[in-house]
Amino acid sequence: MISANRPIINLDLDLLRTFVAVADLNTFAAAAAAVCRTQSAVSQQMQRLEQLVGKELFARHGRNKLLTEHGIQLLGYARKILRFNDEACSSLMFSNLQGVLTIGASDESADTILPFLLNRVSSVYPKLALDVRVKRNAYMAEMLESQEVDLMVTTHRPSAFKALNLRTSPTHWYCAAEYVLQKGEPIPLVLLDDPSPFRDMVLATLNKADIPWRLAYVASTLPAVRAAVKAGLGVTARPVEMMSPDLRVLSGVDGLPPLPDTEYLLCYDPSSNNELAQVIYQAMESYHNPWQYSPISAPEGDDSLLIERDIE
């Protein structure tokens, strides 16, 4: 039975922030740079955190640090605590921020990463009005450059703007669930018409692998591409978010090469002197995105953080 008089531990936010930095960056050295402390100070902080919670958070095996079961458990709570702390501070600081923020979104991001972004912005800046404009990926950069939009969410990295990676997703080949790809025949492709970064990527990937292809269906909108693939007209390549029960993923077994990952990017034009866009961009830049993938292993000999797993 748990005693009602059991003392409550108040977790130190600085210790939690360093703990999360170590988990995210994999080494004490990298975490030390991120939190502006020395490596020895980070080590001392982690010892203090272990003493505070009364549990071992790291299991030491040589130079490697393994995150224990308790460490993994604390990591989830630490992320939530820091998120709500930072959100509360931002909300109080910018609760009176008003105006209209125009966000341009490519069709790939409209029903994937965009809802996450809108939720984050509206929860921290409740008085801010949001105007969303969805267009083809190829036209987003022009809209940001001409200041038709304040920020843009795109899957094509522009060279002229600052870009923040909101999420990286695998890219797959798709066909209808019952579709049979004929071996020895050119790959029947269902693609957007030009200009389209995805179209360019698909054709470049197939050409590099010396795989013959043909255009089976060319569409002007992403919904039309989805409809054509579901109808069994051919094969397309899109991020993992396109997956649905009436589609199936093709792979190397089907004779198709791997595709580069898709980046969902939040872009901002520093030359626009748009203070509102700058505030939102910087806020997102400092917000930890739990969707991001980060490696959990490191080269041999490095003092990396590894997640301890049960071995059969």
From Swiss-Prot:
InterPro entries: LTTR, LysR_subst-bd, Tscrpt_reg_HTH_LysR, WH-like_DNA-bd_sf, WH_DNA-bd_sf. It holds the Pfam family HTH_1. Disulfide bonds: none annotated. Residues 28-47 bind DNA. CDD domains: PBP2_LrhA_like. It comes from the Bacteria. Coiled coil: none annotated. One of its GO terms (molecular function) is DNA binding. Keywords: DNA-binding, Transcription, Transcription regulation. Residues 11-68 form the HTH lysR-type domain. Not known, does not seem to act on the proton translocating NADH dehydrogenase genes (nuoA-N) which are part of the lrhA operon. Belongs to the LysR transcriptional regulatory family. This is Probable HTH-type transcriptional regulator LrhA.
